Amino acid sequence: MHVTPELAPVAKVGGLADVVFGLGRELEIRGNHVEIILPKYDCMRYDQIWGLQRTFDDLWVPWYGGAIHCSVYFGFVHGRKCFFIEPHSQDNFFNRGAVYGFHDDIFRFAFFSRAAMEFLWKAGKNPDIIHCHDWQTALVPVYLYEIYQPMGMRHPRVCFTIHNFKHQGVTGAQVLHASGLDRPEYYFHYDRLRDNHNPHAINLMKGGIVYANFVTTVSPRYAMEAKDQGQGFGLEPTLHIHHMKYGGVVNGIDYDVWNPEIDPHIPVHFNVDTIEGKYADKKALRDRLLLADNEKPIVSFVGRLDPQKGIELIRHALFYTLGQGGQFVLLGSSPDGAINGYFWGLKRQFNDNPDCHLEIGYNEELAHLVYAGSDVMVVPSRFEPCGLTQLIAMRYGTIPVVREIGGLADTVIDKDFSHRPLHERNGYVFRDYDERGLESALGRAIACYYQYPDHFRELMKNAMRYDYSWNHPGQDYLNIYHYIRDK
């Protein structure tokens, strides 16, 4: 049973939505019964829900000493069984036109988490595993063990996955009173929910770590960085205390969506044995973006223009690529107006350059063509819990140039400096977050493209041979589920 604030494609803000969908499908393929609970947002893509109907109309969720009436709807999202919780209250928790971005987000998702648990209890559902995600549902294990287990719900175990430690749900005591956790002095304890920095605040993510039976994050390297290298944003001591139930599992990507053999968004399909088709897609990308038709490598960036993603180095990659005789393509946008404005300025600056195209915004069809038609994909992140860009790029034979951080370090093996066998090397890696570091890796990629085309082609094939589907992560999560189920 997944309890989640997001699910692709109906309520997608970030990678969390793809993880819940992809993992859920993989677990079902392996013969498990999977259900998903999420809020019934007014902004969902209802055209992606099949057979939506009200299935439970007598759910009263405790809130501020009273109760809020909720309806529960059931429907299928691409075959996944989903329950959608709709509260009927003046707060309009989920009728606001967006998933996040409101001053009371902590209360909205504290309520949703309580509603999900109340639904499981009242509907007589008794899952083996409840899998919750990020701070938005971190109170699920707290509610389970402090409220519902004493009432008799003793069977479920909880796996809590942290997709990004940066956002933790730090707040005051009021949310405890609201949700029925009525002993603030009990929860304001270092071993429970009290924030590690602010003794007058509680930390929802910390509560999830303390109360869950197992805690995962989205790559082994990021798990280590969060615990030991300052990427836990204050939760390092808590992770050390609970290190025996903590680990990392690299996310997968959806091979039905990201598959150059069947992709409907690219003109020529290809695989590792017919890689020549990639060059036709490269020409199609040039034609679409009005780039010069020449022998230069296409270096690209696809993703959010967010400080986490390394904006300064993305900009430098553009200038460096052009200076080294390459072409550069960018597809992305930022919710930050200043960042968007800066890249619009760059777009105007290079508007007449036949070797550069910046597309400010996001276009799913174009993204597929960029992945298929590019030679190199830069991912110079400041920090990166997992990263899907490099996984998709490799699926399409596009060589990743990445910073040695988080999931990037777990998935990209440097062509020149790794001790791994040659057939396992699949990209270029740099360590320091600076221009020299980026140049050291991107320069080697461009030089290999020009000077050793046969080596570059083998590197493309190496990248395509890796399996970054949900096959391995699915088994890893099943192992975790069995481990906590049997304890």
UniProtKB/Swiss-Prot annotation:
Any one GO MF annotation of this record: alpha-1,4-glucan glucosyltransferase (ADP-glucose donor) activity
Enzyme class: transferase
Any matching Pfam family: Glycos_transf_1
Ligand binding (ADP-alpha-D-glucose): K12
Keyword Chaperone listed: no
Record key words, sorted: Glycogen biosynthesis, Glycosyltransferase, Transferase
Top-level taxon: Bacteria
Signal sequence bounds: none
Entry EC number(s): 2.4.1.21
Pathway: Glycan biosynthesis; glycogen biosynthesis
Entry coiled-coil feature ranges: none
UniProt keyword annotation of Isomerase present: no
Annotated InterPro entries: Glyco_trans_1 (IPR001296), GS/SS (IPR011835), Starch_synth_cat_dom (IPR013534)
Catalytic activity: [(1->4)-alpha-D-glucosyl](n) + ADP-alpha-D-glucose = [(1->4)-alpha-D-glucosyl](n+1) + ADP + H(+)
A GO biological-process term: glycogen biosynthetic process
HAMAP family in the cross-refs: Glycogen_synth
Known role: Synthesizes alpha-1,4-glucan chains using ADP-glucose.
Family as reported in the entry's similarity comment: Belongs to the glycosyltransferase 1 family. Bacterial/plant glycogen synthase subfamily.
Protein name: Glycogen synthase 2
Lineage: Bacteria, Pseudomonadati, Pseudomonadota, Gammaproteobacteria, Methylococcales
Name of the gene this protein is made from: glgA2
